[in-house]
Amino acid sequence: MADENSGRHERRSQRDRSESTQRRVLDATLRCIGEQGYVAVSLQDIAEMAGVSRGAITHHYPSKIDLTAAAIQHFVQWRYERVNAAFAGKDSIELRERLDILWGEFQAIFPITFELIVALRADKDLLALYRRNAKGRIEEITTGYDDFFPELSGMKVSGVVIAVMAAFYRGAYIESVARDPAYIEEMRAVFQDMLAAYLAADRKTA
């Protein structure tokens, strides 16, 4: 019995170490892509960032495409968890305040988001693998954002509205590279007004 328990503990420890290594590798992949861009990053760059050997990476992810596809899924889940933590205990705040929180979170991680979008656009094999691996997972996580915006409850297009929010914030961040910050704030205010008006009109017709 002692040997059996010892064996189980060893298997769990090996599994825990393997999962920990994979998380470090995926985190390092995202950091490297965010800093250097997908095309410029090599597996060796990622290995050095993660503090592991190149072989430790290829043991789990045979190619850069396999690794990046897994890293994108990891990023989507991590982003959702980050936003979820930011909204913790803030259920009763106004819509505009919640939109400000979402903007702040998306803005903080946009460099990675942007580089991942560029990677998916540039590498058709990566895009195909990512779509196969993701399946309904992305839609599932996107649907979770509804919890932060109860105003969307019952809407047939709630997922679309969330996607519109995310698309606007991505676009606003790109604009912020060359635009005056005051102009970006004006854009955000107009968007919030438009969204509030749309939601109010939807409630009236419901």
Describe the predicted segments one by one:
Residues 1-9, 139, 168, 174-206:
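C-terminal peripheral helix-coil segments that are non-catalytic and often amphipathic
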Residues 1-36, 43-49, 66:
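Basic, helix-initiating cap at the start of DNA-binding domains
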Residues 9-16, 20, 62, 66, ...:
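Residues at secondary-structure transition points
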Residues 35-38, 51, 58-70:
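HTH DNA-binding helix-turn interface
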Residues 42, 56:
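Residues in the helix-turn-helix
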Residues 62-66, 70, 104-107, 121, ...:
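Residues in soluble alpha-helical coiled-coils and helical-bundle/repeat scaffolds
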Residues 66, 70, 77, 81-110, ...:
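Hydrophobic alpha-helical connector segments
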Residues 80-85, 104-114, 124-151, 159-160, ...:
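Amphipathic alpha-helical packing segments from all-alpha helical-bundle domains
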